[in-house]
């Protein structure tokens, strides 16, 4: 079974890397012909595409390396008090600018601050937003909320109006090689590939001593809840 999992993951990783590599190669071949030498606007647009695809490929390789370190507990987290609203405002600006379809964001933050590693938390939430956009129709509505649990943990929720996840797949979507019903969701306009992003969220939650859960109704919505403990860190600060 382990060998099969590794085989599936390797195949999926190659599949996900193939698209940006193909785009980069095709762009270079077009530039080599010299056809765009007298068309500066199209040439500039192609360079922009090449840059985006190169950054996508680099981000993918970095995510694989980070996942490996998280799995082996080799990554040290730098926990600090963060402004959740400020982090989300940055992400909303980023995704609103690059999305290829209308995306409406709503914030409902009862917890305005959170103790976490800012870099990893931001990337985890970014992955949840990215999935929400990929697996939704022509118009996307995303609600991001937060609140404090009685034990002090901060919960961050990301809810979309997308295609949803079949109940039979929900227990497997955080596995590194899994992307639930990718073929079916692709037919509905979703992304193809595999679920590195959700496994990353799972590993970041785990590294913080927290959890991530999903609630979804196929054809209606998906809501991911990221719970991050706060008490241990805050108690250690008070002791100092």
Task: Describe these PLM feature segments.
Residues 132-133:
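Short helix-loop "hinge" at the ATP-lid/N-box region of the Bergerat-fold HATPase_c
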Residues 165-178, 182:
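Short conserved segment of the HATPase_c
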Residues 78-93, 122:
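A conserved beta-strand-to-alpha-helix junction within the catalytic ATP-binding
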Residues 72-77, 113-116:
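Conserved micro-motifs of the catalytic ATP-binding
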Residues 139-152:
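Short beta-strand/loop element within the Bergerat-fold HATPase_c
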Residues 52-57:
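Short alpha-helical segment of the dimerization/phosphotransfer core of two-component systems
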